[in-house]
Amino acid sequence: ALEYQYVMKNPKQLSFEKFSRRLSAKAFSVKKLLTNDDLSNDIHRGYLLLQGKSLDGLLETMIQEVKEIFESRLLKLTDWNTARVFDFCSSLVFEITFTTIYGKILAANKKQIISELRDDFLKFDDHFPYLVSDIPIQLLRNAEFMQKKIIKCLTPEKVAQMQRRSEIVQERQEMLKKYYGHEEFEIGAHHLGLLWASLANTIPAMFWAMYYLLQHPEAMEVLRDEIDSFLQSTGQKKGPGISVHFTREQLDSLVCLESAILEVLRLCSYSSIIREVQEDMDFSSESRSYRLRKGDFVAVFPPMIHNDPEVFDAPKDFRFDRFVEDGKKKTTFFKGGKKLKSYIIPFGLGTSKCPGRYFAINEMKLLVIILLTYFDLEVIDTKPIGLNHSRMFLGIQHPDSDISFRYKAKSWRS
């Protein structure tokens, strides 16, 4: 379980780059990356716009989008409404993420456009495990159709019509024009890759966050208390409209909320860290030695740590406060008597670490805060939900079925 440290120490001999480029070519029809190092480097530089001050700007936009979506629709629902958790999460996460990153659609039928794009995206995502397999795309007719349909919605001409596009999308548009000129479809393929990366794991992760919180009312209560204490300490009042505001630092200060999100990711993330061997080599770890040939793949599987009872007591259980100790973030976990440097690894490591991880976690935190602050939530189905392992090694697992819950906006008259 600790051998990922040895894999990370050999970045030149064990490379993520070629594997990543082939995956982009197959899944998103991004072909030029296979042969163009400068393009790859420019794309990676663009990911800096998902950190620091640029991330603060994205969070501001996201808060505005959340406010508009909830106030125009969900906050008006003062009677109990029933919904399916996965449907509810996919609808919310898709619209908030899309409008935060790509901007607002100005067309009169924007609701219909967003709804259709979401349905198309979910169909495309259902095919994703097949797209990254060795099956030729020509045999995956539906997947290829959905891929092309979404790309045509994300061409530079279409994206330029969006209002309030994020910095990363604007910069990406300009940078891609440098390489592709007027090849609209090729640039749209890159946008599909960005859209998929921003949604494919956040949607199921948000499902699991809601699922576990609905199953554990005691966790909801503690998180509500933490959020209420924060709002009081910053002089913010809850009322009929969404007036609460958070900076990135303030979101990070909510230790119970962060712990609950990390615990969700620990339980449902089954991503792997994959590297391609660049030259014949001997690879030694603490426990054994291996002879690796050029072209072999090495995979490290973080769930071995996430589910190790020596690292996490009762690893199958959801414990929302697992990452809290004495009111602060708990960061000390041990294996074989040694303190682990990395004990929760849902986003990969090294060069393959997800550049949008802060964006995704902030989005989940914000949605949990709004749902717990402004709504009463109750589970209807109490049946346990399992993981659907069709995305093994590819990230957050989808549930094997959906469950119903009910919700209503809280009354503020009192």
From Swiss-Prot:
Its cofactor is heme. Gene3D superfamilies: Cytochrome P450 (1.10.630.10). It comes from the Eukaryota. Pathway: Lipid metabolism; bile acid biosynthesis. Its EC number is 1.14.14.29. It catalyses: 25-hydroxycholesterol + reduced [NADPH--hemoprotein reductase] + O2 = 7alpha,25-dihydroxycholesterol + oxidized [NADPH--hemoprotein reductase] + H2O + H(+); (25R)-cholest-5-ene-3beta,26-diol + reduced [NADPH--hemoprotein reductase] + O2 = (25R)-cholest-5-en-3beta,7alpha,26-triol + oxidized [NADPH--hemoprotein reductase] + H2O + H(+). Keywords: Cholesterol metabolism, Endoplasmic reticulum, Heme, Iron, Lipid metabolism, Membrane, Metal-binding, Microsome, Monooxygenase, Oxidoreductase, Steroid metabolism, Sterol metabolism. GO terms for cellular component: endoplasmic reticulum membrane. It is found in: Endoplasmic reticulum membrane; Microsome membrane. It is an enzyme of class 1 (oxidoreductase). It is a peripheral membrane protein. GO terms for molecular function: 25-hydroxycholesterol 7-alpha-hydroxylase activity; heme binding; iron ion binding; oxysterol 7-alpha-hydroxylase activity. Highly expressed in brain; also expressed in liver and kidney. Heme binds at C354. Its main location: endoplasmic reticulum. Pfam families: p450. The keyword Iron applies. One of its GO terms (biological process) is cholesterol homeostasis. Oxysterol 7alpha-hydroxylase that mediates formation of 7-alpha,25-dihydroxycholesterol (7-alpha,25-OHC) from 25-hydroxycholesterol. Plays a key role in cell positioning and movement in lymphoid tissues: 7-alpha,25-dihydroxycholesterol (7-alpha,25-OHC) acts as a ligand for the G protein-coupled receptor GPR183/EBI2, a chemotactic receptor for a number of lymphoid cells. Belongs to the cytochrome P450 family. This is 25-hydroxycholesterol 7-alpha-hydroxylase.
